[in-house]
From Swiss-Prot:
Single GO BP term: DNA catabolic process
Chief localization: cytoplasm
Keywords on record: Cytoplasm, Exonuclease, Hydrolase, Nuclease
Protein known as: Exodeoxyribonuclease 7 small subunit
Catalytic activity: Exonucleolytic cleavage in either 5'- to 3'- or 3'- to 5'-direction to yield nucleoside 5'-phosphates
InterPro entries: Exonuc_VII_S, Exonuc_VII_ssu_sf
The protein's Enzyme Commission number: 3.1.11.6
Entry GO CC: cytosol; exodeoxyribonuclease VII complex
Enzyme class, first EC level, given as a word: hydrolase
Source lineage: Bacteria, Pseudomonadati, Bdellovibrionota, Bdellovibrionia, Bdellovibrionales
Keyword Zinc: no
Family stated for the protein in its record: Belongs to the XseB family.
Domain of life: Bacteria
Disulfide bonds: none
Gene name of the encoded protein: xseB
Amino acid sequence: MDFEKKLGRLEEIVQKMEKGDLALEESLKLFEEGVKLSRECHQRLNEAESKVKLLMSVGADGQPVTTDFTSEEN
């Protein structure tokens, strides 16, 4: 499953759990799935961040440069 699908599924799980009308077993099952998806998405974001750093590692003058990739929306 790609990142976008995992994130979409995670959003579905959150919406279902926020309603508060699930049985305990179903809540636990969805929570477990959500934690797994969250970890996988976080790992993929870390990989993407590392790739951005690598791609931006050489400046216009040819000198190595490390630029941290941070979102200003956070």
